[in-house]
């Protein structure tokens, strides 16, 4: 590790998003330095640690690993700093006059006797105080940076901590460093716990136990749970904190009193919710029950009215060339009769035909319809299937970005105060919708609006917490129409036929003689790799007339030789190998390359995107990229340390390198992440794994993602065991219970 000391002569480049800075440092020689600095000005004196590196384009650079600011030790250094622009309102000329008047005593005068600055022509008493205030703030920030770096906190995070707490940060860290996990994005319980250990906070601190309990609930929500039974919560938190279960149990009442948790009695056990999760379920239940009670103009249909509706349905069938079965006709009738309707059914059962008939019926009544789906891909499919514009739920609700300078968080413009101006709202792929998005949707639905929710309850539940569609059906409060008949055209597809057989637990003929459902028995990982590459690179693109990039590998697991992480490395080298014209960058454990297929792996409501014309002119812009959105890396800018990704609908997002931790390669993705998407061809490697994961539900979801053909590579026994395995990971949710409780009160 090399040490340097000098002053900054020139800021060459600064990325305001991540603090990445390129600057010239005068040490006697001019040295180009690169590192992360959130507040660096020309004239600053720095002590650096790092290493010299050789950049392929920009030559020799000093890569900074740590630094600290130094105060100028002579009058020349003070003048250089004051005149650099670091202090607003002080230029080179005024800096020279200040230093000429006070010499090497300048900084002491500013700190201890700032009123004396007014002795200089051009400086009023007010300006003198402003200069002193700016100097004090910069001094405080630098002291804080040094203090935080001592505990291993990165420069970027240190700045955010200082901006959040100011001079209070010392008291917060000494008393309760776990507060950082609540207040600052990017600091979770584990990072706060590491910091607390360095500071010397006792492992049995009340703050640590409470924060650990809340983290356990938050972590459980990542598994889809809305709550945990008390016994499960205590056991998990005790294991996390390495403390006796009694210590955990003692803190639960305190968290309840502080309104951090809601605890409900459940027989001999309890049910423990994070406060916001309990009220999210309760709010959804209340809004649904209120919508369900809304009297529509039709009210209770008389026989003559019902006959008139069905006659209109017959006319639509003739006009559109459709043939509805009795359940489909019933669905249309129920959509007219009720304010809420749930329409469910597997592939090939006519959900799209039913939706189209409902749309045509309400169009004929002169009503305004909104169509939506959880993802861009699902919305695009809905548009293509109906001929009616469908949007993502986020776009329909008009997501607006955060404004940190005003404290405004990302939010939806459409809400209870500004509801959607629609008579009918149809939402497809409801199995993907988690409790938080559903709550936001319901807030924007005004009384009198019909809400029609469509989905396949046999799909995997949402990635986020809750199992909204399943709970709505289980409540038995709302009208549900479950389509069951497989129509003739769908019967010609083995994908559809086999998917329905899976649901019934029926074994299928595993052969490669179908037109769209192939099984290739391959019982070793290297052989599966070889055939997967052949299928993607040569065979399937010709068979389904699609690009290799459109063919999706779906796997149950993240880890292991047939998990997402390993498969992506294998497929990247095949589909997007390195070449002289492609830039690449290693970020963490992932090598990203221009041309890579990637996926956003968490909701980010702050990310800004834009759509540009072929001439580079912005024609649309917005905020928000969401868990499961897939795109292509178009450009890697090594100098700016940014990555440009283009998503569906030509939305372009520029990520800083640190932000790329929210992105991963997507040549292979988990079956769970594929929900709501459809691909020309799907390849599923299945060679064994945990029984709870390798189940019928997972196989069904993966197979039904394929539009043209699905190919399973692996073990015959594993596929047969998955078909027979009904077990699913239970989700702890209670939306159905809340609905029934409120319906009983109504």
Where are these regions (language model features)?
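Conserved lysine of the Walker
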Residues: 351
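C-terminal accessory regions
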Residues: 620-622, 627-746
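P-loop (Walker A) phosphate-binding loop of NTP-binding proteins
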Residues: 346, 374
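Conserved helicase motor core of P-loop NTPases
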Residues: 457-623, 742
């Amino acid at each position: 590790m090399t040490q340097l000391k000098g002053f900054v002569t020139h800021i060459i480049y600064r990325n305001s998003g991540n603090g990445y800075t390129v600057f010239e440092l005068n040490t006697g020689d001019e040295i180009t330095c690169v590192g992360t600095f959130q507040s660096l000005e020309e004239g600053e004196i720095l002590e650096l640690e790092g290493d010299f590196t050789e950049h392929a384009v920009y030559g020799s650079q000093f890569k900074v690993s740590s630094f600290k600011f130094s105060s100028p030790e002579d009058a020349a250094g003070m003048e250089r700093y004051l005149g650099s622009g670091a202090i607003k309102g002080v230029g080179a000329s005024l800096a020279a006059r200040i230093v000429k008047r006070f010499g090497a005593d300048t900084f002491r005068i500013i700190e201890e006797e700032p009123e004396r600055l007014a002795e200089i022509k051009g400086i009023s008493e007010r300006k003198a105080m402003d200069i002193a205030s700016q100097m004090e703030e910069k001094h405080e920030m630098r002291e804080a940076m040094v203090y935080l770096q001592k505990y291993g906190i990165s420069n970027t995070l240190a700045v955010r901590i200082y901006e959040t707490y100011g001079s209070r940060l010392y008291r917060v860290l000494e008393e309760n460093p776990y507060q950082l996990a609540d207040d600052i994005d990017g600091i979770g319980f584990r990072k706060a716990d590491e910091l607390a250990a360095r500071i010397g906070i006792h492992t049995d601190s009340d703050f640590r136990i409470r924060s650990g309990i809340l983290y356990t609930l938050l972590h459980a929500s990542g598994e889809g749970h809305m709550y945990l039974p008390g016994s499960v919560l205590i056991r998990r938190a005790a294991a996390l904190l390495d403390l006796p279960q009694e210590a955990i149990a003692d803190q639960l009442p305190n968290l309840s009193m502080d309104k951090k948790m809601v605890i409900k009695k459940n027989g001999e056990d309890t049910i423990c919710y994070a406060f916001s999760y309990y009220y999210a379920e309760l709010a959804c239940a209340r809004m649904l029950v209120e919508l369900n009670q809304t009297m529509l103009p039709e009210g209770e249909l008389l026989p003559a009215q019902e006959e008139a509706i069905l006659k209109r349905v017959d006319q639509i069938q003739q006009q559109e060339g459709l043939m509805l079965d009795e359940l489909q006709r019933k669905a249309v009738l129920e959509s007219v009769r009720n304010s809420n309707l749930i329409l469910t059914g597997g592939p090939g059962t006519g959900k799209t035909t039913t939706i189209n008939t409902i749309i045509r019926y309400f169009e004929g009544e002169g009503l305004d319809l909104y169509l939506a789906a959880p993802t861009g891909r699902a919305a695009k499919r809905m548009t293509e299937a109906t001929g009616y514009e469908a949007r993502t739920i986020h776009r329909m609700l008009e997501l607006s970005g955060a404004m940190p300078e005003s404290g405004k968080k990302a939010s939806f413009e459409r809400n209870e105060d500004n509801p959607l101006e629609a008579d009918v709202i149809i939402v497809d792929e409801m199995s993907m919708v988690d409790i938080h998005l559903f709550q936001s949707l319901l807030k924007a639905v005004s009384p009198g609006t019909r809400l029609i929710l469509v989905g396949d309850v046999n799909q995997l539940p949402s990635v986020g917490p809750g199992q909204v569609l399943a709970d709505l059906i289980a409540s038995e409060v709302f009208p549900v129409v479950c389509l069951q008949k497989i129509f003739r055209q769908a019967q010609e597809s083995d994908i559809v036929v086999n998917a329905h057989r899976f649901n019934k637990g029926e074994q299928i003929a595993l052969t490669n003689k179908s037109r769209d459902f192939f099984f290739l028995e391959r019982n070793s990982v290297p052989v599966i790799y070889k055939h997967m590459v052949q299928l993607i690179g040569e065979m399937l693109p010709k068979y389904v007339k699609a690009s290799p990039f459109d063919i999706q590998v779906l796997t149950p697991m993240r880890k292991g030789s047939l998990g997402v992480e390993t498969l992506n490395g294998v497929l990247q080298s095949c589909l997007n190998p390195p070449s002289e014209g492609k830039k690449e960058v290693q970020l963490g454990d992932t090598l990203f390359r221009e041309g890579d297929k990637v996926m956003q792996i968490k909701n980010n409501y702050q990310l800004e995107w834009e759509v540009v014309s072929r001439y580079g002119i912005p024609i649309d812009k917005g905020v928000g990229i969401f868990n499961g959105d897939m795109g292509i890396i178009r450009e890697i800018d090594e100098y700016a340390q940014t990555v440009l990704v283009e998503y569906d609908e030509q939305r372009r997002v520029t990520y800083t390198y640190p932000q790329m931790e929210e992105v991963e390669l997507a040549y292979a993705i988990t079956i769970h992440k594929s929900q709501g998407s459809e691909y020309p061809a799907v390849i599923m490697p299945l060679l064994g794994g945990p029984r709870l994961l390798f189940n019928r539900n997972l196989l069904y979801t993966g197979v039904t993602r394929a539009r043209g053909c699905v190919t399973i590579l692996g073990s015959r026994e594993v596929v047969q065991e998955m078909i027979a395995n009904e077990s699913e990971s239970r989700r702890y949710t209670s939306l159905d219970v809340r609905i029934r409780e409120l319906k009983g009160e109504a």
